């Protein structure tokens, strides 16, 4: 057990307790952030005259050699160390001697781990933003190619009105755009530097916290040392944002699974994103989409766990907070994997446009437009609604669509109908005349697509 502290104790830490407390098995992924933060801390200490320039250079060179050796596989992060902080410091002392013992001057593991977590989270938010943008670009590409691809829109999972594939994909664009904006907001709100807060009450050393913050790319130092070492709000916000991303992916997955079914046949998931049954050779299963849907609960669990962990913790730092890391790591890894997979699946998926259009015709999706036709000919809407309800009932009995009715059949139900009813209820007319902003009409969609392109240009 490699331990750098414990002079106050007269007994060795019980191995069971040591292993129970140790976090090296998971916080070793912080090694780059821990070294990055230590370099900035050392540069600040030298600037303030707390370290000599020679000591500064020795420590910086030693830290860089550790980083390089870990990256190249020459140095393994083993579980003989309690955490990543002790691993870095112990190896530094082994390499450069007494100068390495000065690394921790004016610093506590409390503000050190708070910094590491922020540096790591900041980097991962940037990566997540990139993956969300990839999704947005793929959605936009589908939208641009399908402004006139007619399909049924659904409410209550029943065919409702004709829309376009571009319009449907546009709904998901809006969702993931909000996700992207949420990630940007979290980054901005969390971008303050906790280093220099010490254990909870700052330090007696003359530290230049603003300089350290500047070196590390933060907007400035945190303003309360107790909050600095016990703040997990930004992680809760991130877990909430990741849960929302997964909720959107899960909804999308559910639709893809339904659309891919034999009953719908709206899409064909590429073989490279499908699996086959071990017993039924005819099966092509949408396992990728199903797993994305299934992993959503895992990310929800991370959010709930962190909230539950934090709810009863008094100020300032408590060991409970160590429990945040595995949850955050797993949630981030899960969401990154799901975003990348889903974007790839979407890029290779084929859309059955003819099937979508045919589904519209046989679902009475133009019934609302038939009612609007009557309203435009002077019939009160409530009466028009009842008349079209009778039309639908008639068609169901005859096993035909509204388009298949003769004019005589129309007139038997209402004399208001004329020959132009057929144009009024054609799927193309139903979609094309809906051109207010946000509607599925091609002209409306082109304006929205232009706005989306402008947004992505700024990403």
What are these regions (language model features)?
Residues 1-202, 207-214, 220, 272-276, ...:
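A helix-coil-helix interface module used to build multimeric assemblies
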Residues 2-37, 98-99, 280-459:
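Glycine-rich cofactor/substrate-binding loops
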Residues 38, 66, 128, 132-135, ...:
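Amphipathic alpha-helices that form helix-helix packing interfaces
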Residues 43-51, 120, 164-167, 236-244, ...:
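Short, well-ordered beta-strand elements within core beta-sheets of diverse protein domains
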Residues 51, 75, 264-265, 380, ...:
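Conserved hydrophobic residue
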Residues 131, 157, 161-171, 175, ...:
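Short, contiguous, pocket-lining structural segments
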Residues 145, 182-185, 189, 218-222, ...:
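Conserved helix-loop functional segments at active or binding sites
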Residues 216-308:
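Acidic, glycine-rich loop-and-beta core segments that form the ion-binding/anion-interacting portion
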């Amino acid at each position: 057990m490699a331990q750098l502290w414990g002079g106050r104790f007269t007994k060795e830490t019980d191995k069971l307790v040591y292993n129970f407390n140790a976090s090296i098995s998971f916080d070793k992924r912080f090694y780059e952030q821990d070294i990055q933060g230590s370099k900035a801390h050392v540069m600040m200490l030298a600037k303030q005259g707390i370290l000599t320039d020679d000591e500064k250079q020795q420590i910086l060179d030693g830290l860089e050699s550790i980083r390089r050796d870990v990256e190249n596989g020459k140095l393994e992060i083993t579980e003989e160390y309690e955490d990543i902080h002790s691993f870095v410091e112990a190896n530094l002392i082994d390499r450069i001697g007494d100068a390495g013992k000065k690394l921790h001057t004016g610093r506590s593991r409390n503000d050190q781990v708070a910094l590491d977590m922020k540096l790591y989270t900041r980097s991962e938010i940037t990566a997540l933003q990139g993956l969300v943008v990839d999704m947005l670009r793929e959605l936009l590409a589908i939208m641009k190619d399908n402004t006139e691809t007619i399909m049924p829109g659904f409410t209550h999972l029943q065919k409702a009105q004709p829309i376009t594939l571009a319009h449907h994909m546009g709904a998901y664009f809006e969702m993931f755009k909000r996700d992207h904006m949420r990630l940007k907001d979290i980054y901005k709100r969390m971008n303050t530097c906790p280093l220099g807060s010490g254990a909870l009450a700052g330090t007696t050393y003359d530290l230049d916290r603003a300089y350290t913050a500047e070196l590390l790319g933060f907007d400035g130092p945190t303003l309360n040392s107790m909050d600095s070492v016990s703040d997990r709000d930004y992680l809760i916000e991130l877990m909430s944002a990741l849960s929302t991303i997964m909720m959107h992916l899960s909804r999308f997955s559910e639709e893809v699974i339904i659309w891919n079914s034999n009953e719908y046949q709206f899409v064909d998931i590429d073989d490279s994103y499908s699996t086959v049954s071990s017993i039924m050779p005819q099966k092509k299963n949408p396992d990728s989409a199903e797993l994305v849907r299934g992993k959503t609960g895992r990310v929800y669990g991370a959010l709930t766990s962190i909230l539950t962990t934090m709810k009863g913790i008094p100020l300032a730092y408590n060991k409970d907070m160590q429990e945040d890391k595995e949850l955050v790591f797993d949630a981030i890894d899960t969401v990154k994997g799901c975003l990348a997979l889903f974007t790839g699946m979407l890029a290779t998926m084929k859309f059955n446009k003819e099937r979508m259009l045919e589904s519209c015709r046989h679902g009475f999706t133009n019934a609302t437009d038939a009612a609007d036709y009557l309203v435009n000919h002077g019939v009160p809407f409530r009466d028009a609604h009842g008349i079209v309800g009778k039309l639908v009932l008639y068609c169901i009995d005859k096993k035909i669509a509204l388009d298949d009715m003769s004019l005589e059949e129309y007139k038997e139900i209402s004399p208001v109908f004329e020959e132009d009813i057929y144009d009024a209820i054609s799927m193309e007319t139903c979609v094309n005349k809906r051109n207010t902003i946000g509607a599925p009409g091609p002209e409306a969609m082109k304006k929205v697509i232009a706005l989306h392109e402008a947004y992505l240009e700024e990403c």
